[in-house]
Amino acid sequence: MKNIFKISMIGLVFALVNCQSVNYSKMFYEGVQPEMISDKFSFTEGPSADKEGNVYFTDQPNDKIYYWDWKSNQVIEFLDKTGRANGTHFDKDGYLITCSDDQGEIWKISKDKKVEVLLKGFEGKRLNGPNDVWNDELGGMYFTDPLYERDYWIGFKQEIQHKSLYYRDKTGKVTKLDTFTQPNGIVGSEKLKKLYISDIDAGKTYVYDILGEGKLSEKKLFCEMGSDGMELDKHGNLYLTGDGVHVFSRLGKKIYHISIPEKWTSNVTFGGKNNNILFITASKSVYTFPTRVRGIK
């Protein structure tokens, strides 16, 4: 009995140590404000960092992809004619995966700008318009397919009536995993075995446990807030966007707000040399915000 009690106490102490709250006041520098890097765009979206810490992002109305070079603090055009890329994420091999919704496609783009169309539809039907994507370490990808009908879509006819979350495995097989009101931002973590997804029109963000390749638990409500884009830091805090950037603890409690002087903040990611600079896409502009915390790998 004593041994069982000791084991139980050791387990409790271990759990408390692992659940110990982060000192959030030390996550961000006092008095530091986001810095606008450029405001020459129409609508910025989909930031994702490469292995060097440079951040690629889209200007969907102008059909371009740019990147922020952290060494020079300059924004450089990467690609014109992107299929109207929206959300992006680098895969394990360093290819930029884009949600190119002009024809309801997902693209794979190399650093030397060679394009491969990975996905055009589901079960023989055109996707509504892939919005955001997260690649896992197995070579698969989770992506959202809401419907935001664009002015530049020519002859569009909705063929899929649901708005859903999908998984495409490394062989190209696509599986519908769940359906939402309007799924949007998505981010995951191999380390935490978690996948987060925003149902923006429902005003909710959900979390799944990742159980295996394309296998998820039942979704659980994470917080009563929808989001356009999202990011995770190494502590498991989730960063949501809309009116600036809202930071939630891994337990779903709002702990911080970063104000951005734009009408809409679309997305956010970590980048820079040490993966500790928040790169924020907001309407016609992009911003950087140095922090004391690093993004999760």
Q: Residue spans of the language-model regions?
A:
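Sequence-structural signature of mature extracellular/luminal beta-sheet repeat domains
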Residues: 19-297
